[in-house]
Amino acid sequence: MGRYENAAALAALVRDTEVHRDCYADAEVFDLEMKHLFANTWVYVGHASQVPKVGDTYATSVGDQPVFMVRHADGSVRVLHNRCPHKGVRLVQEGCAHAGKFIRCPYHAWTFRTDGSLLAVPLKQGYDPQCFGATEAAAGLAPVGEARVYRDFVFCRLNPVGIGFEEFFGDSLSTLDNMVDRSPEGRLEVAGGVLRYMHRCNWKMLVDNQTDTCHPMVAHESSAGTAVRVWNEAPEGTPKPMAVELFAPFVNPYAFFEGMGIRVWANGHGHTGVSDSLHAAYSPVPGYWDSMVAAYGEQRAHAILGDVRHNTVYFPNIMVKGPVQTLRLFKPLAVDRTLVESWTFRLVGAPDLLLERTLMYNRLINAPTSVVGHDDLEVYERAQQGLASRARDWLNLARLYEPGEQERTVAVTNGTNELQMRNQMRAWVRFMTADMPEGVAA
């Protein structure tokens, strides 16, 4: 047994206002995250619009486990482990594909129905029925512990026993509701492909940064700050480019971010942008308001579009931006390596200019060739390098800490409070140890 393979040792890594560097830099801790954390939590798999037809598949990973979702014959979306029960071959290639009426292994042509059940085995007369029926392979493809489709967002929990979907997410699902409701038809579709790039840092650094509101005006001074300075020199009457609208809020002063507010929920979820947001001052899109009023009525349309949450963290590893219809998935590959996927969505029934803004935002902020995102990348990688130092063991999360705050399951507070980071790490302890005999209720 390793030094951290017990609940007490893991819990000792997280204090009220500090986190031990091993949470970000120790390979054993990372392996335990793959075994426990990503198995005990509800993790994002994909979006139902990626598998629109029966037999469509989308292959990805949850933690270190290869999985795929597939549209079954009854129209439901199933999530299965991406492993043939015969010789262990990965069945579905990464990304979107179409399997047809059944899934066929490329090695020995064993075939499976789209619910994972075994359909056919070549030369089956070579297997004794009683003997074969007692093997694991006879059960077909292994499903994940549980899967749930919510407003077309597909999540799964790998472990067969654990916290329920509604209990895990609670009121945090209101962010997904708001993003979907921004469509006059109440539907989203994945659009514009996916942008991926590698980060040589621990995955939790990216999650932490989503609600770190004390860094934008510093880290993004050379990128967003330059864009603002150039715009300020433009001749009077020059139409304001969409790119400037997207860049400018990143260099707002501390007072703006303090007033923006932050909300946390139980189990590690939370968001910035309660009373104001980086996305609150975009130019109106012609025709959009009228289509929303026609769909929802004026009062409801005001409520939907007036909720401009900035970054919503869904623990453990996604961030959603409802007002610009983007989702970032932080896929852990190693203790010091993370693949970031940036996804964009179309508001079905809304003007195309909204999708244009979404795609531009993703390119400017979240792409491998982005401007703002590379400021963050540089800092993440410097942080990972700095953690090699043994001069200090603890990272500080003490900003605006209040004794006893962990007793509150929902809180709204100053936008520069590090409460959400502390909230995440308390959830980290809980779900890292949930399936251990001496599990810790953090």
Report residues per predicted region.
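Short, contiguous pre-domain boundary segments
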Residues: N6-C23
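Generic structural signal for secondary-structure transition and capping sites
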Residues: F38-W42, V89, H215
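Short Pro/Gly-enriched beta-strand edge/turn motifs at strand-loop
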Residues: A39-P52, G126-C131, V308-Y314
